Amino acid sequence: MDLNKEWEKVQEMAFTSWVNSVLEKRGCDKISDVSTDLSDGVKLIYFLESVSGKKFPKKFDLEPKTRIMRVQNLHLAMLFIDEDLKIKVQGVAAEEFVDNNKKMILGFLWTLYRKYRISVINEGDKSSEEGLLAWCKKTTEGYNNVNITGFKSSFRDGHGFLALAHKYDPTVFKYDEYEGHDNIARLNAAFDFAEKGLGIPKLLEAESLSKGNVDERSIVLYTSLFFHAFRAKEEREALEASQNSLNNKLASLEQSLEGEKHSQEELVKQKKDLEDALNKIREQNDNRNSRITDLQSKIDDALRGLDDEKLAKLDLESRLAKCEKDKAILELKLAEILDEKDRLEKKIDEDKKRAEAERLGLGLIRQHLAAQFSDIHKWQSFLEHPETVPYTGTPVDLDSELSSLSFEEQAKKLASKLESENILIEKYLNGKEEAKAAAKK
């Protein structure tokens, strides 16, 4: 059998198994021939929805009776692949499916398989075929006679596939027991273990593979089935571990119901919560894409919230700076008011001192004037009664300076004193007026 025929056979078997595994999870009938059973577009659309995790955006005919209806369904499927899934499929039109063009249909499915089953493989810093090869090398590390360096050369003797099958479940067979077998026997044993233990169909012929007469793409495709079988096992084990953990918690709650006096309603609620959590875990794969979308939306909202907080912070800082500026202005005005207060208090003290001095001065002036007026009265009495003052009846005790003077001289002396006192009073009053005028300015 030439390589193209071998490759076509491998693809047909592999893709039939892949499509059926996807449709089975959706509850759809299986297909038996990829070249004919996808020709109405219905199962193809169901398959595309499930494998991509995206809802088909348009209405399509669930029971197409005519060729035109089938072509229309398939045309919508091609648009979905191109516009929504962003997958470029060259040279495949809706008519290829209706006309059962096996070669074109297999090429179409190979493109999808690479997108959703090979490109998703990652191991270290490698992906796709390189990642798959690195994964095989890591998984078979430590097995005798296994040296994974390339798909074409590293799997011809059967050791590589046998090591992968043994790594998946070491309890099924002993790896070393097949050291003495020839390459074809070892390959057939590996294919049998893979089919029975991992559910991987026999896609390759042992004799052709041992001679190197198998297309490398066939080996890549077959090897990728091991990778996904391991990943499915890991997911099952993780799910079982989660289920066991929840079952243990449920059992613990049931024991608590018997041994402790907890509220029955609360325990029932806790049990229901755990059962709900178990159901959520079972639905994890179906909801994964939706959660990722929601998470991205929340991240976008959080980023927008951060921008709003930054703007609010800048506004607050601006207001705070304005408050600091206003505070500084108020402090300056307060300092000016305090200085003015001190100046006024000093002026009030000075005015009080000046008023007290004026009061004392006026008192002295009053005393001087009283004495002078007394001398005048005495003098008038003396003129009428030279020896005594009429209102006292006592002798006049004139100032010695006045008694030695004549009458005219004494009158002049008294007039001079009165004039001096008047000058002092007038000078004082003028000073007061000048002080008031200066204060008003």
From Swiss-Prot:
Residues 9-117, 126-231 form the Calponin-homology (CH) domain. It is found in: Cytoplasm, Cytoskeleton. GO terms for molecular function: actin filament binding; alpha-catenin binding; protein kinase regulator activity. Pfam families: CH, Cortex-I_coil. Residues 1-229 are annotated as: Actin-binding. InterPro entries: Actinin_actin-bd_CS, CH_dom, CH_dom_sf, Cortexillin-I_coiled-coil. The keyword Translocase does not apply. Its main location: cytoplasm. One of its GO terms (biological process) is aggregation involved in sorocarp development. Keywords: Actin-binding, Coiled coil, Cytoplasm, Cytoskeleton, Repeat. Residues 229-362, 406-430 form a coiled coil. One of its GO terms (cellular component) is phagocytic vesicle. Actin-bundling protein. When linked to F-actin the actin filaments form preferentially anti-parallel bundles that associate into meshworks. Plays a major role in cytokinesis. Negatively regulates cortical localization of rapgap1. PANTHER family: SPECTRIN/FILAMIN RELATED CYTOSKELETAL PROTEIN. Homodimer; parallel. Belongs to the cortexillin family. This is Cortexillin-2. It comes from Dictyostelium discoideum. The lineage of its organism: Eukaryota, Amoebozoa, Evosea, Eumycetozoa, Dictyostelia. The gene is ctxB.
